């Protein structure tokens, strides 16, 4: 269903779209920085694949407004850079899969998602991608929680990414609701996104505090040594049993 946009002043659109784009740009930039620091992807693997396919089809395949296509293309190029990091570090989230199989999975999901998006666009006559984009946002928000739970640590993540992503999604929701008022599905979906984003912020904050670190430390080191067995934290204090073992070894050496 192609939705007609509501009659609204252009300045209102840009007041909402500006913080939306800025929030997402900051989130992507900080996620890239965090991934380089921790050697783990800052954006969930499946989100990178599906989102890249979405931007690719909107930029280069599907019909778009002249003003919208360059914007979509810019985001597609950013996604390509994140894809590089995904191929370099993303396999670490799938220890039972070889790196070759992981690469096949990545490009397979991208191809499938692109075909799905094209077919959905024509089936629903969703020329602007508003339905698929809103649905993708729900999936994206959930994926951050799944990533945190899967790793069991804050590795590759930061409160600044979580907050920037939340701000971007908040203003994205209001942009859609202003452009297409009265559509209850959009209201439901964005209320879902905002709730999930807030939940992720709380869970991540608690996890970083649990690791004995400040959630707001800008240059906090990796929470664990990448690829290290057992995922011990870098610079973390030894556990109680380990400390007793070390003290016993010192006493034994001294008495010998």
Task: Kindly give the residue locations of the regions a language model identified.
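Alpha-helical membrane-protein topology signature
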Residues: 1-256
């Amino acid at each position: 269903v192609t939705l007609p946009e509501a009659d609204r002043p252009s300045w209102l659109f840009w007041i909402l779209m500006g913080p939306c784009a800025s929030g997402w740009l900051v989130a992507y930039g900080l996620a890239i920085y965090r991934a380089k620091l921790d050697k783990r992807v800052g954006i969930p693997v499946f989100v990178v694949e599906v989102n890249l396919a979405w931007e690719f089809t909107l930029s280069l395949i599907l019909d778009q407004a002249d003003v919208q296509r360059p914007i979509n293309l810019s985001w597609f190029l950013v996604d390509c850079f994140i894809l590089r990091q995904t191929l370099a570090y993303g396999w670490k989230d799938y220890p039972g899969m070889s790196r070759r199989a992981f690469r096949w999975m990545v490009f397979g999901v991208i191809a499938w998602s692109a075909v799905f998006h094209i077919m959905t666009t024509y089936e629903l006559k969703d020329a602007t991608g508003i339905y698929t984009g809103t649905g993708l946002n729900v999936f994206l928000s959930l994926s951050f929680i799944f990533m945190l739970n899967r790793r069991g640590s804050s590795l590759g993540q930061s409160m600044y990414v979580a907050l920037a992503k939340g701000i971007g999604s908040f203003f994205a929701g209001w942009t859609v609701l202003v452009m297409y008022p009265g559509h209850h599905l959009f209201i439901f979906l964005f209320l879902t996104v905002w709730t999930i984003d807030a939940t992720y912020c709380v869970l991540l904050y608690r996890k970083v505090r649990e690791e004995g670190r400040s959630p707001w430390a800008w240059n906090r080191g990796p929470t664990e040594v990448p690829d290290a067995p057992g995922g011990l934290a870098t610079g973390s204090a030894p556990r109680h049993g380990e400390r007793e073992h070390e003290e016993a070894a010192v006493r034994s050496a001294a008495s010998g």
